[in-house]
From Swiss-Prot:
Its main location: membrane. It is found in: Membrane. Residues 21-536 are extracellular. Acts as a ligand for Notch receptors and is involved in primary neurogenesis. Can activate Notch receptors, thereby playing a key role in lateral inhibition, a process that prevents the immediate neighbors of each nascent neural cell from simultaneously embarking on neural differentiation. Required for boundary formation during segmentation of the hindbrain. Required for midline cell fate specification prior to germ layer formation; regulates specification of floorplate, notochord and hypochord. In inner ear, it prevents adjacent cells from adopting the same cell fate. This is Delta-like protein A. InterPro entries: DSL, EGF-like_Ca-bd_dom, EGF-like_CS, EGF-like_dom, EGF-type_Asp/Asn_hydroxyl_site, EGF_Ca-bd_CS, Growth_fac_rcpt_cys_sf, Notch_Cell-Fate_Det. Glycans are attached at residue 479. It comes from Danio rerio (Zebrafish). One of its GO terms (molecular function) is Notch binding. Ubiquitinated by mib, leading to its endocytosis and subsequent degradation. Ubiquitinated by the ECS(ASB11) complex, leading to its degradation by the proteasome. SMART domains: DSL (SM00051), EGF (SM00181), EGF_CA (SM00179).
Length: 772
């Protein structure tokens, strides 16, 4: 037991030491399991019964795998130092082990990862167990064990599988296994780590055993050093990537093998950076002083002799026929045209030669073999004999040459200026001047303003350099031909855009500015809205007050309408049967006037105790009535002892009341016939004849009165609604009074309302009493 514990501790220590530098996987592939009888290791049926000749037990088989360090006598007891696992139920009795299960709970081969160097040996224990159910996979119960298979082997790292077959009792298990390194791990124990990379930490790939293989252009242990350009100076050059050669400070060149001289050094060399070692013949700090100019530069040309005269100076001794500081100029003896009379000159070394035309001879062809007798002069030239022999011609104006054979071209010297055209004359020339210039050679500016060059009303002024136009406002240019841009002086402010339209400018303002030149800052919209709020509130208040006033007016109109409606309703109620008492009135009545107060036919008269106008309305003939007006001879009678009663005639009666009045008139005529008159003094009776006479008299008088009161009738129309019932009553009373006319005081009794009209003959008074 102590030995086993020691081995276990040793294995754990070994794994801890190797874990950080190695990695691999032990793979176990279960292939086939056979349990022909379907019994457990104790030979009992997996379901608890004994096996018989005609019945086979069913063993739901799963496996427990334990991988340990090498043990001569491997024990299935934990711990499993290299790893272990329990599979789900893979089949019953004899079956082929699948690669996977549908639910993904099992993968074949079984992988057990290593974090340490593979030792090369192992112990493998595989137990086949029976499960009562697929969920119950406990391994502690020994009665569930079907068989136990133990293997101790030596195993090298590789991709090849090792096959194995174990037979225990009535069971048989076929399986295979191998140990492979993880990615980037190599070697016999997967202890060599190598991961290919191409970055600042290295540029390499890995070999079969994990060795580093540098990429092209790289070197070093981890391939971090680039290989520079071949030939690059290892001391004075370096490279950051393969194939280049960068020089260190003080060196230059393709291979960084040249030192840099001192700045400004002209004719010197260096052995180390920043030196200036002068070459032979040069001196000074920068080796710029030539101590042997003739040797270094050879400045003298054309065979001249050079002599050094000091630092950077020399003198050339020229050969004949050459001149200049370096004898670079060849002297041409023909430059002065030494040959005369048309002879041609040939330049020779340090001399010249003239080739004379026929008839001439001499070094410069100055002698002629002809005489004046030969007439050699042309174009009117005068011939004269030369005392030395020969002749000479005196040419007229405009001709030249030995024989006056050449016509002089006066325009050959281009005497005309300012683009004038030159015309050659016999003895002179003529310049045709362009506009604006005068003079023989067209060199003077003429009167240019005479050509009116200034346009658009400009004023022309002559000047020394030509004319000048003073332009009117709106135009510019030399001739005032260009209109001035209105936008030229940028009249628009605050970033606005200027546009020209119809000889004026328009400014397109940016947002927030206004005015002709966009010079005004417009108020912010939010502040403007805020400033509008009080005026909105005031306007809302005024509108609310107006609505309230209108509402009050509507209410007042409605109330007044209801009051008038109620008044009409009360009058209708009175007309339907209510009796009111009319106070005794004292009136000055005249029998010749149809003045009476009637209470017959329509409704009782109210006691209103105030002056009131009585009017009677009569419509057209279709209503069988006519308008009438009554007026007393004296002051009108008043109710309640009031001394005036006015009678007015309506000229317009509403159609809705016409029917009522017509009915009242009919009732009046019927009632008056039934009135019985009694004399208060002598008890005389009214006759029908007297009543008719009285009615005729009244009718004529009413007609006259109607015409005189026509203007007053309009005023009575406005009061028709308030006095319509009183007017009808007056009409009825008048008719009744006429019917009851008598010489003596008489009384009229209204049989319907039991009213009595008393008329006094002496005072012409009418007293009306109503019995209540």
């Amino acid at each position: 037991m102590g030995r086993h514990l020691l081995l276990l501790l040793f294995s754990i220590l070994y794994m801890l030491l190797c874990q950080a530098s190695s990695s691999g996987v032990f793979e176990l592939k279960l292939q086939e399991f056979l349990n022909k009888k379907g019994v457990q290791g104790n030979k009992n049926c997996c379901k608890g019964g004994l096996t018989t000749s005609y019945q086979q037990c069913e063993c739901k088989t799963f496996f427990r795998i334990c991988l340990k360090h090498y043990q001569p006598n491997a024990s299935p007891e934990p711990p499993c130092t290299y790893g272990g696992t329990v599979t789900p139920v893979l089949g019953s009795n004899s079956f082929q082990v699948p690669d996977t299960l549908p639910d993904g709970s099992f993968t074949n081969p079984i992988r057990m990862n290593f974090g340490f160097t593979w030792p090369g040996t192992f112990s493998l224990i595989i137990e086949a167990l029976h499960a009562d159910s697929k969920e119950d996979l406990t391994t502690e119960n020994p009665e569930r064990i079907i068989s136990t298979m133990t293997t101790q082997r030596h195993l090298t790292v590789g991709e090849d599988w090792s096959q194995d077959l174990h037979s225990v009792g009535r069971t048989e298990l076929k399986y295979s296994y191998r140990f492979v390194c993880d990615e980037h791990y190599y070697g016999e124990g997967c202890s060599v780590f190598c991961r290919p990379r191409d970055d600042a930490f290295g540029h390499f790939t890995c070999g079969e055993r994990g060795e580093i293989i540098c990429d092209a252009g790289w070197k070093g242990q981890y391939c971090t050093e680039p290989i520079c350009l071949p030939g690059c100076d290892e001391e004075h050059g370096f490279c950051e990537k393969p194939g280049e050669c960068k020089c260190r400070v003080g060196f230059k060149g393709r291979y960084c093998d040249e030192c840099i001289r001192y700045p400004g050094c002209l004719h010197g060399t260096c052995q180390q950076p920043w030196q200036c070692n002068c070459q032979e013949g040069w001196g000074g700090l920068f080796c710029n002083q030539d101590l042997n100019y003739c040797t270094h530069h050879k400045p003298c040309l054309n065979g001249a002799t050079c002599s050094n005269t000091g630092q950077g100076s020399y003198t050339c001794s020229c050969r004949p026929g050459f001149s200049g500081a370096s004898c670079e100029i060849e002297v041409n003896e023909c430059t002065g045209n030494p040959c005369r009379n048309g002879g041609s000159c040939t330049d020779m070394e340090n001399t010249y030669s003239c080739t004379c035309p026929p008839g001439f001879y001499g070094k410069n062809c100055e002698l002629s073999a002809m005489t004046c007798a030969d007439g050699p002069c042309f174009n009117g030239g005068r011939c004269a004999d030369n005392p030395d022999g020969g002749y000479f011609c005196q040419c007229p104006t405009g001709y030249a040459g030995f024989n006056c054979e050449k016509k002089i071209d006066h325009c050959s010297s281009s005497p005309c200026s300012n683009g004038a055209r030159c015309v050659d004359l016999v003895n002179s020339y003529l310049c045709q001047c362009p506009d604006g210039f005068t003079g023989m050679n067209c060199d003077r500016a003429g009167d240019e303003c005479s050509m009116y060059p200034c346009q658009n009303g400009g004023t022309c002024q002559e000047g020394a350099s030509g004319y000048m136009c003073t332009c009117p406002p709106g135009y510019t240019g030399r001739n005032c031909s260009s209109p001035v841009s209105r936008c030229q002086h940028n009249p628009c402010h605050n970033g606005a855009t200027c546009h020209e339209r119809n000889n004026r400018y328009v400014c397109a303002c940016v947002s927030g500015y206004g005015g002709r030149n966009c010079q005004f800052l417009l108020p912010d919209r939010a502040s403007q809205i805020a400033s509008d709020v009080p005026w909105t509130a005031v306007g809302s208040g005024v509108l609310l007050v107006l609505l309230l006033v209108v509402a009050c007016a509507v209410v007042v109109v409605c109330v007044r309408s209801k009051v008038q409606q109620r008044r009409r309703d009360r009058e209708d109620e009175v007309a339907n049967g209510e009796n009111e008492t009319i106070n005794n009135l004292t009136n000055n009545c005249h029998r010749d006037k149809d003045l009476a107060v009637s209470v017959v036919g329509v409704a009782p008269v109210k006691n209103i105790n105030k002056k009131i106008d009585f009017s009677s309305d009569h419509d057209d003939l279709s209503l069988t009535t006519e308008k009438r007006s009554y007026k007393t001879r004296h002051a009108p009678a008043d109710y309640n002892l009031v001394h005036e009663v006015k009678f007015e005639v309506k000229h317009e009666v509403k159609l809705e009341h016409a029917g009522k009045e017509t009915t009242m008139a009919n009732e009046l005529s019927d009632s008056c016939e039934d009135i019985k008159c009694q004399s208060l003094q002598d008890s005389s009776e009214c006759t029908e004849e007297k009543r008719r006479k009285r009615l005729k008299s009244d009718a004529s008088e009413k007609s006259k009165y109607s015409e005189s009161r026509y203007s007053e009738s309009k005023y009575s129309e406005s009061k028709y609604s308030e006095s319509k019932y009183s007017d009808v009553s007056l009409y009825s009373e008048s008719a009744c009074a006429s019917a009851c006319a008598s010489a003596s005081t008489s009384a009229c009794v209204d049989t319907k309302y039991k009213s009595v009209m008393v008329m006094s003959e002496e005072k012409d008074e009418c007293v009306i009493a109503t019995e209540v």
